[in-house]
């Protein structure tokens, strides 16, 4: 396969529906990819910043958290934009394998990769870099939940009771959840009040 054919195949993937995935609007499909690419770029950049700012600071905090954040950025970049790693053949295979899995797998993977650098070294660089990866996971999680019902379906479901009948709608100020509850007196003390 030629280089241009391979590049066209890699760029056409976001338009295809994932295997077994829910119907997602086009702006969520492309938006999640773009957010993932931007998140990976900033995670790599701020992870490198954490690693290079090791001089005079905590080794375990900056060095380890920065390396984990950079690795998370590279994984997200490899899964969201495998055309950035054209020279590595296995990246495309791994990306196709992850694309075949349900959306909640990718959402959980991204959220799980984003949390350790934030807990290991809480700072703006780790919060922003890993926070964007976590936001990408949250968008994939929303896509995994699927499309909500139409407004008419939600109104019909809200009007029904748990027994399947129609709920008696009331607009009284004294309507309550419990049918035999005594209302508070609006003019004075309740008759059973001990005035203590």
From Swiss-Prot:
GO CC entries: cell projection; endosome; presynaptic membrane; synaptic vesicle membrane
InterPro entries (alphabetical): TVP18/Ca-channel_flower (IPR019365)
Record localization: Cell membrane; Cytoplasmic vesicle, Secretory vesicle, Synaptic vesicle membrane; Presynaptic cell membrane; Endosome
UniProt superkingdom: Eukaryota
Keyword annotations from UniProtKB, A to Z: Calcium, Calcium channel, Calcium transport, Cell membrane, Cell projection, Cytoplasmic vesicle, Endocytosis, Endosome, Ion channel, Ion transport, Membrane, Synapse, Transmembrane, Transmembrane helix, Transport
Regions that span the bilayer: 35-55, 59-79, 114-134
GO molecular function: calcium channel activity; identical protein binding
Pfam family, one: Cg6151-P
Feature type site, description Calcium ion selectivity: 80
Presence of the UniProt keyword Transmembrane helix in the record: yes
Membrane topology, from the record: Multi-pass membrane protein
GO biological process: bulk synaptic vesicle endocytosis; cell competition in a multicellular organism; clathrin-dependent synaptic vesicle endocytosis; photoreceptor cell differentiation; positive regulation of neuron apoptotic process; positive regulation of presynaptic cytosolic calcium concentration; synaptic vesicle endocytosis
Regulation: Channel activity is inhibited by La(3+), which reduces Ca(2+) influx and thus inhibits it's function in promoting activity-dependent bulk endocytosis (ADBE) in response to high stimuli.
Subunit structure: Homomultimer. Associates with the dally/ magu complex.
Function noted in UniProt: Transmembrane protein which mediates synaptic endocytosis, fitness-based cell culling, neuronal culling, morphogen gradient scaling, and calcium transport. Regulates synaptic endocytosis and hence couples exo- with endocytosis. Controls two major modes of synaptic vesicle (SV) endocytosis in the synaptic boutons of neuromuscular junctions (NMJs); Ca(2+) channel-independent Clathrin-mediated endocytosis (CME) in response to mild stimulation, and Ca(2+) channel-dependent activity-dependent bulk endocytosis (ADBE) in response to strong stimulation.
Entry's family note: Belongs to the calcium channel flower family.
Protein name from the UniProt record: Calcium channel flower
